[in-house]
Amino acid sequence: VLFVVRFFHRFEQRQLPPRKKADHRPTAIFAYNDLVALGCYRAITECGLTIPTDISVVGFDDIAFAEYYQQPLTTVIQPTVEIGIKAAEILIHKIQNPPFAEQKKLVLKPLLAVRSSTSICPRK
């Protein structure tokens, strides 16, 4: 199930099917950032559901208070220091090798901080 959220932190109750329609409800939500994930918390509880028993929630970017929220948020941690270092190295290389510095593809591995907003899916 894909949810499109217009505002960076807004996730509304009407986007989730009610508890009685469990077959049509997602078992997990992977939000594109932690603020949207935390916005999901309110919508989920307003539906009478619990995290992570009914729905697991995962964010992306590990904002400062994600681990201190009422239900610590499982989130993907970007290697921001490494991103900065690699970006600076690429920029220096391009400056020192104009005008046709080669294109570089760089893949950095994120980390998953598993906290208490996720659990094993109880349904098939």
What are these regions (language model features)?
Residues 13-123:
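Flexible loop/turn connectors
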Residues 1-10:
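Short beta-strand elements in bilobed, periplasmic/extracellular small-molecule ligand-binding domains
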